[in-house]
Amino acid sequence: MATYNTLQDRIRVAKELLERVDKICSRQGREVEGRAKLCGKLRAELKFLQKVEAGKVVIKESHLQSTNLTHLKAIVESAESLEKVVSVLHVFAYESPDGQKQTLVVDVVANGGHTWVKSIGRKAEALHNIWQGRGQYGDKSVIRQAEDFLEASQQQPVQYSNPHIIFAFYNGVSSPMADKLKEMGISVRGDIVAVNTIEGGEEEDEEDQEGDHEDLVEEEEDGEDDNDDDSDDTDLMHTRVDRDTIVASLAFPTEVKVDVCNRVNLDITTLITYVSSLSHGNCHFTFKEVVLTEQAAQERQEKVLPRLEEFMKGKELFACQSAVEDFRVILDTLGGPGEKSRAEELLARLKVVPDQPSERTQRLVMSSKVNRRSLMIFGTGDTLRAITMTANSGFVRAAANQGVRFSVFIHQPRALTEGKEWRATPI
């Protein structure tokens, strides 16, 4: 009966977690990258549990208590506690100190990309034992994993700042481990528990069996079971976790300090959007061109200029020579009197700099989405360590697919329409 009740509870939790993921994503107001992957893992876990329920798979009750669901639940709870979640189970590529190409799974990327979270559901006892070299062969300690996170984060800056790392513990963490993580610059969330010295080096009685059923689950959990030979800090005195003595309970940091980038590089698409007649109230038209009618409808639904102004406020504004020259050509060809007047006012606020694409930008391979003009504009922004404002999301995605991620502010596009209003139908 106990096994049956435990099984039913785990099935209920799996179903609830799927519903909670939907709520998290709807709260963000945008699609959360990795949602399908997380839901896939939850469904795989649910399917496995339902096989156990149907008698197709036989496992011990202790294994039910320590399924992959523990880690998946920790990920969901972390995402629920954070703002501006952009992705879950995101895989970042980086190079290890010896030059080897590595990948790292970040459970939750939040705060618009500025915060990386590793969610840990394993018990404090097991984590502490592994750290002291008393785990199973191949177990990788949390401290070693923290080193990987630091290495990867330094190679994945967001707006030219390294992401802030949080390790979220949902079954406690020993006080010495928490102290070590803090020394490394990593924030800790969860209950910090005391440790006691083990007389005569006796072993820990309680073994954490998390993941024992993993080979039975169709989709392997890849977030928390990193394996690597690890025996760091072997000179530590053997200690036992005292779960009953909680030293501190730490919540997620409410305010993560982010170094704000005060330099902005304007793409041609932004220059056009900023001066467009559509952006200045003249959006109540049906144009002959379908794309202009669509942009007018978007503008009536959500004005783009306030977003641009808010982002640009108090920042140093730049544009490269190529962007300005091509903008002027487009303006001379398609711009109306009001648009041209606003353009002169905007250009007077900018510091125009020579094209100076960064080294990594020049390594990009040309394609339909990656052209020379975009390389000059985004590459110059990269050299300036500025955030490039753009409506050219196609280039941003294409560059990211080649491993180059630019710091960008993406907005909806608006075309120059003043010269076409005379033959448009007012609405």
Curated annotation (Swiss-Prot):
Residues 200-236 are annotated as: Disordered. This is UPF0415 protein C7orf25 homolog. Residues 200-234 have a biased composition (Acidic residues). It comes from the Eukaryota. It comes from Danio rerio. InterPro entries: DUF1308 (IPR010733), DUF5614 (IPR041076). Disulfide bonds: none annotated. The lineage of its organism: Eukaryota, Metazoa, Chordata, Craniata, Vertebrata. Belongs to the UPF0415 family.
